[in-house]
Amino acid sequence: ESFAVARPEKIFAETSPDGRVRLSFQLHTELEDILDCRAALEIREKETGKPVFSAAYPVKLGPGETEYMFDARVDSPELWYPAGYGKQALYELRLQIFSGMREVASFRHRFAFRSFEIEEKRFTEKQGLFQFRVNGIPVFANGGNWVPPDMLPGTVGRERLRHLIALAAECGYNYLRVWGGGYYESDDFYDLCDESGIMVWQDFMFGGPEVPEFDPAFRAECRREAEEVVCRLRRHPCICVWCGSNETDEFYLVDRNCKRERPGGYYYGWTLLHRDFPEIVRRLVPDAVYIPSCPFMGTAAPAGTENNAHGFGTCHTQWLPQFSPDEAFDRTVIPTFMNEFYGMCPVPASSVKRFLLPEDLDCYCNPVFSAHNMLEVQRNDEWGQIFRHLCFHDPRRRFDVPLAELLRGFEICAEELMTRYLALLRRNRKYCGGAG
C-alpha cells in the first residue's frame, strides 16, 4: 500500500462463487479541491500470477474521506476449499490511482471465491444436525480451539505462527475456533489459515463475564472495536463464522448458579451480542454467518430445549465422562457440533523439570508442584477423576508414584480418552458436523 495524495482505507472485495467481485474502499485526502483521476484495477491468480481481469475507472478525489465502489468479474473462478476438500485458490487485486501520469495511491488486496452456510436438521426430539457447507459441499470440521500461543502477543511472530499452523495441518485439522477468552490474532495468522485451508470460527473477545453495556461510552467503544476487527479480517476466506462471545449466554441465561434476573430477563452484555454485533457483521459482511454466543442451541431444536443440549447446535463438554462403561458410552446423545472439547491434562514432565528441582519431583502432592497447579487452587476435580482411573480408585497411590511417571500416565490416559470420544463422533457423522 502506498499513497502520495490519497490514503486508502477499509478495503474489501465482496465476492460471489460465480465470479462477481465488488471492491469497496475509502480514500482519505488533504485536498482542498476536486481532482480528476483514473483508477486501474487488475486481478491475478495468486499462485500463478495469471491475469484474469483488468479495467479502468474514472475517479474524483475530494477533500476528506470519500467512499468508492467498483464492480468486476472473473470468468470461471477457482473456489477456495478447506483442507481435504479441494484447492485453496486465492486471488490478488491491485488498484492504482493516477492523476495524469502520476500515481497518487495504490494498494494490493488478497481474496478468494467461496460460499459458506450452516445446515441444520432435526431427526428426533433429542437429536439433530449442525454442519458446515462450503461451496455446497458438507464438511466435517476437524480441529480444535486456538488459544493465545503466548501471554505476550508481541513475542509471537509469523514464523512461530507458521510452525503452529503447520502442526495443525499435519494433524489433519481443517478448522480452528479462535477462543473468545484470548485476543485477536495478527493478519499473519489468518493469512496462514487461508493458505492452509483451515476454517476459522472467530469469537469476539468476550470470554464470559457481564459487561457494563448500560454505560453509553463503553457500549460505543465495544461497537467501534467490533467494527475495526470485522473491517480488518473480513477479507479472509478462512473466517466462516463470527460469534459474539464464549459461553456468555450459557452462563447467564441457562446456568442456575449464574443466571441473572435483570430488567427484561437479560444479562448485561446481551444487547451487544444479540443486537449490536449482528448488525455490524451484517452491514460490513452481508453474507457472513453470525452466532451470538457459543454454546448455541441452533434453530432446529424443539421449543424448550436448553442451551448446550448436545443433540442440537454447538456444545461444550469434557471428555472425562468417557470413563463410563462401553454400554453407557455408546448410548450417549451424539453432539451435533463439539465446539469446545476440553479436559485438563498436565504438561509433560520435561516442561515441569524446567521449574522444579529434582527433589520436588517425588510425588504429585509435593507442595512446590501444588503451588504451580492452578486446578488445585480452583479445587477442580478433573484431575481427581483421572487419578481415580489411573490409580485404580486407590487415592493413596498418588503418594507412591513418582511425579514424572504419573504425568506420563496422565498423557496416555488423556490420549486414550480423546481417541475414544473422537472415534464416536467420526463414526456418527450423519449427526455430528464437527469436533473442536
Spell out what each predicted region is:
Residues 1-176, 184, 195, 334, ...:
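Secreted/periplasmic carbohydrate-active enzymes, especially glycoside hydrolases
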Residues 2, 117, 147, 248, ...:
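Short loop/turn segments at secondary-structure transitions that flank enzyme active sites
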Residues 9-12, 293, 353:
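Short coil/turn segments at secondary-structure boundaries
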Residues 31-32, 121-303, 435:
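Active-site mouth of glycoside hydrolases
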Residues 89, 133, 159, 220, ...:
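A generic "alpha-helical surface" signal
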Residues 202-209, 310-328:
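Acidic, His- and aromatic-enriched active-site or binding-groove loops in soluble protein domains
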Residues 242, 279-282, 291, 298-301, ...:
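Substrate-binding clefts and catalytic carboxylate motifs of secreted carbohydrate-active enzymes
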Residues 257-260, 305-310, 352-356:
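Short secondary-structure boundary/capping segments
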